[in-house]
Every structure is written in C-alpha cells, then in structure tokens.
C-alpha cells in the first residue's frame, strides 16, 4: 500500500477562554454528562487561560512527523478546529490520493478508536468526489517504542524523588475511565485489557514487579458504573497503608491533556501532599521524536506488508487492525 501523505488525527482542544464551553459541549454531546461536571471542567481549562496543552504539542508532533516521514503531513481534530472534515477537504484540493492516518490514541475501544473511525467516514463524505483514501493505522499500545517511552519516563520520575524514597515508591498507572458498558461494547473489556497489558509491559521494562492500575477523570452520572478504582481513591488507600512515595504514570494518555496537567499534576498532587506522600508524575510521549518514529514504523508495516512490530511478537489482547475510509476492520469487536 502506497501513501502520498500522512494525517495526524487528534482529540482537539480550545485555544482560548471563549472556546472552552463550546468545545466541551462538542466532546460530551449525547453522553448525558451533568452540567455541573461541564462547569467544573471549564474551570480547569480557564486555570490555564482556556488553552489546551495538546494544541501546541500536536503542532510540535506534526513537525517531528515531517522530519521522520518522506510525506506531507496534515493535521485535524475530532472535536475542535482544525476539524478533520476541513483537513480532508484541503487534502482533496491538494490532490492527495491515499493518506496514512495516525491517531493520538494507542487503544482499541469505542471512545479511543471507533469514534475516530466514524470521524474519518464523516470527513470523506464531506469531501465528496475526489476525497483521498484514508487508512487509519492500527493501535500501538504494545509497540516497543510506546513501551520504551513510558519506561524512560518512569525512570526519570523515580530519579526526581528524594533518594531515600526511590526504592520504596509505589508505581501507579492511570488511564481515562469509561463506563463499564462502553468498555464491554467493544469487548470483552478490550480497552481495559489493553491498558492492563501495556501497564504490565511497561512495569516489567522499568523493573517493577508490583504496581497498581487505576482510572481517572470520570464524567458521567454517578449512578452509571465506570472503570475503577479511581486513582485518587487508590492514592488514599496507599497512604493509609503507609506508602511514602508514588510514581504516577498516565499510560492512557500519549500527550498532556487537561486530564493530565489538572487532574494529576494539580488535584492528585495536592491529595498526595496533604497525605504526606511524595509524588512524581511520569511524562507522556508528547512530541518525543520516538513517537514520530513509531508512526513511521506503523506506516512501514502497511507499505511493505510487514508483520506488526510488537514487544513480544504477538498480540495477547487482539485489537483493531488498520481500517480504510472509516469502515471498521473485520474483527468481531469492530463490526458488532
């Protein structure tokens, strides 16, 4: 399969205070999120001037991709400007015929994969005749470079702790929670199992035999079951058991979303300080050059029909495959 362009497809985020509420309404439309929760998250964004940190990160990643790939690189978002629909129209007008789509989500699942596939389909319909073929690259939660970046981040975070606490620090992984029903929708529990498997790979690479896997940033009605335990609740459990230091690894995020810089760096750190627990947060990949190399590796798999590159050579948690033009791949959890 030959590509004449690449498209970085991300989540999107506001670029100013006046954009925050419309952005959040875009993200949560149809999800039955209480208005009080939107009010709360609005304050989180306004704390940072109403600007999402992922905007600058994505532009930096586009630059890294342009260095790594011998292709023009376009950029579009699912939930905010530049929308993927507008980007694909531009690609059509530029004469692009077939583009590899790299999404800033490492996982399978409805929220982390299927909704991006749906966005690709919408964008091609909007572009109409002459729309380029869009090939979404596979999830990469077990790619060696994905694991390596988080291993290095944990090692650096541990080094930032007081020397006397490093050996006893508890490693805590966290990812964005979703409703249990949503996790089962592309099941059985595909998203949570992939996160768990990636955490196991990263912990082993960083030299940790024991760790905790937690979830964060739930936003739905309180009566709806979401993935648990919550990272804050687990922190309090650890503190009560005498844990003196934690290393929090946001393995579910490939960039510093507001859920990282507010929910973890602000709220969770404050909780840890109040409980007398030393806190270190591992970095996300952001615009690490290795992230661009990872994208190039996925493109190479399709261009040269190579076996997917995985840490252990096989996929014990079968995920989505590459998909074309917004059509789900052939696996049962995608077409069900």
From Swiss-Prot:
Source organism superkingdom: Bacteria
Residues noted as binding Fe(2+) in the record, renumbered to the chain: 176, 259
Annotated positions binding Fe-coproporphyrin III: 52, 116
GO MF entries: ferrochelatase activity; metal ion binding
Keywords, sorted A to Z: Cytoplasm, Heme biosynthesis, Iron, Lyase, Metal-binding, Porphyrin biosynthesis
CDD domains (alphabetical): Ferrochelatase_C (cd00419), Ferrochelatase_N (cd03411)
Enzymatic reactions: Fe-coproporphyrin III + 2 H(+) = coproporphyrin III + Fe(2+)
EC number annotated for this UniProt entry: 4.99.1.9
Keyword GTP-binding applies: no
GO cellular component: cytoplasm
Places the protein is found: Cytoplasm
Statement: the UniProt record of this protein carries the keyword Cytoplasm: yes
Primary localisation category: cytoplasm
Known pathway: Porphyrin-containing compound metabolism; protoheme biosynthesis
GO terms, biological process: heme biosynthetic process
Any single Pfam family the record assigns to this protein: Ferrochelatase
Family: Belongs to the ferrochelatase family.
Function: Involved in coproporphyrin-dependent heme b biosynthesis. Catalyzes the insertion of ferrous iron into coproporphyrin III to form Fe-coproporphyrin III.
Protein name, per record: Coproporphyrin III ferrochelatase
Lineage: Bacteria, Bacillati, Actinomycetota, Actinomycetes, Mycobacteriales
